Amino acid sequence: MFVPFLIMFREGLEAALIVSLIASYLKRTQRGQWMGAVWVGVVVAAVLCLAIGIFINETTGEFPQKQQELFEGIIAVVAVCILTYMVFWMRKVSKSVKVHLEGAIDNALNSGRGQGWALVAMVFFAVAREGLESVFFLLAAFQQDVGIGAPIGAILGLVCAILVGMAIYWGGVKLHLAKFFKWTSLFILFVAAGLAAGAIRAFHEAGLWNHFQDIAFDLTDVLSTHSLLGTFLEGMFGYQEAPTVSEVSVYFIYLIPALILFFLPPRSTAGSAIAAARKINP
């Protein structure tokens, strides 16, 4: 429950901050009449992401068992890639997003005829990317946790993100965003490592990967996944009481380089600024 909550809170907060920055800039530049276009972009993006998530979730239930395992592995790999990209993209461009977002708004509203649609498209792409990141992660999370806790956590995370975003816009809440994104990003890397290990397990169950399947260690008597702590760690980090050599290897092959790159001093380059502009206004 906590992992879907945190991911949706973080992703929802990113989307809420984007909308908040757009609204503040439009208000500050006396262009508040364009807020309708902003909300059109937000709603269309949200509906599209929700529809994609529901469609994928419903159609995969009809697959035979091995195909379901294969799909779970693919979704886990996609989720790992998206989460990793999300962490390192935010690390690079968090200080320059506002500048480039305002530039993208000016470009959209100075585009002549169809400027309203240009603003709708800009907001749509900015919000839809955050939404699609969430969709693929939640699909992976829901496959690992089939209980009601994961959907409830995701909904609560999104609601909290919206409330915090509104509070930030109205000036009632001051959140140290740099620290927030830094520590949630670190947490997400451990989550992604667990998903990577889960992907190799799914590929084995689908019959695609049969190497290094010896049990690396067995902690059943020490920390079983049926215990409260074991269940918590399984849902949060993909913990397994008796993982195979391949699962442990994939976990650390992903996690160690990711942590090294994460703690390296970030580069402040024009390339980061260009990346930010492309994500906001492709």
Curated annotation (Swiss-Prot):
<feature type="transmembrane region" description="Helical">
    <location>
        <begin position="2"/>
        <end position="22"/>
    </location>
</feature>
<feature type="transmembrane region" description="Helical">
    <location>
        <begin position="180"/>
        <end position="200"/>
    </location>
</feature>
<feature type="topological domain" description="Cytoplasmic">
    <location>
        <begin position="169"/>
        <end position="179"/>
    </location>
</feature>
<feature type="topological domain" description="Periplasmic">
    <location>
        <position position="1"/>
    </location>
</feature>
<keyword id="KW-0410">Iron transport</keyword>
<dbReference type="InterPro" id="IPR004923">
    <property type="entry name" value="FTR1/Fip1/EfeU"/>
</dbReference>
<dbReference type="GO" id="GO:0015093">
    <property type="term" value="F:ferrous iron transmembrane transporter activity"/>
</dbReference>
<keyword id="KW-0812">Transmembrane</keyword>
<keyword id="KW-1003">Cell membrane</keyword>
<keyword id="KW-1133">Transmembrane helix</keyword>
<comment type="subunit">
    <text>Part of a ferrous iron transporter composed of EfeU, EfeO and EfeB.</text>
</comment>
<dbReference type="GO" id="GO:0005886">
    <property type="term" value="C:plasma membrane"/>
</dbReference>
<keyword id="KW-0408">Iron</keyword>
<comment type="function">
    <text>Uptake of Fe(2+) ions across the membrane.</text>
</comment>
<feature type="topological domain" description="Periplasmic">
    <location>
        <begin position="57"/>
        <end position="69"/>
    </location>
</feature>
<feature type="topological domain" description="Cytoplasmic">
    <location>
        <begin position="266"/>
        <end position="282"/>
    </location>
</feature>
<feature type="topological domain" description="Cytoplasmic">
    <location>
        <begin position="91"/>
        <end position="118"/>
    </location>
</feature>
<feature type="topological domain" description="Cytoplasmic">
    <location>
        <begin position="23"/>
        <end position="35"/>
    </location>
</feature>
<feature type="topological domain" description="Periplasmic">
    <location>
        <begin position="140"/>
        <end position="147"/>
    </location>
</feature>
<feature type="transmembrane region" description="Helical">
    <location>
        <begin position="36"/>
        <end position="56"/>
    </location>
</feature>
<comment type="similarity">
    <text>Belongs to the oxidase-dependent Fe transporter (OFeT) (TC 9.A.10.1) family.</text>
</comment>
<feature type="transmembrane region" description="Helical">
    <location>
        <begin position="148"/>
        <end position="168"/>
    </location>
</feature>
<protein>
    <recommendedName>
        <fullName>Ferrous iron permease EfeU</fullName>
    </recommendedName>
</protein>
<dbReference type="Pfam" id="PF03239">
    <property type="entry name" value="FTR1"/>
</dbReference>
<dbReference type="GO" id="GO:0034755">
    <property type="term" value="P:iron ion transmembrane transport"/>
</dbReference>
<feature type="transmembrane region" description="Helical">
    <location>
        <begin position="245"/>
        <end position="265"/>
    </location>
</feature>
<dbReference type="GO" id="GO:0033573">
    <property type="term" value="C:high-affinity iron permease complex"/>
</dbReference>
<feature type="topological domain" description="Periplasmic">
    <location>
        <begin position="201"/>
        <end position="244"/>
    </location>
</feature>
<keyword id="KW-0997">Cell inner membrane</keyword>
<feature type="transmembrane region" description="Helical">
    <location>
        <begin position="70"/>
        <end position="90"/>
    </location>
</feature>
<keyword id="KW-0406">Ion transport</keyword>
<feature type="transmembrane region" description="Helical">
    <location>
        <begin position="119"/>
        <end position="139"/>
    </location>
</feature>
<keyword id="KW-0813">Transport</keyword>
<keyword id="KW-0472">Membrane</keyword>
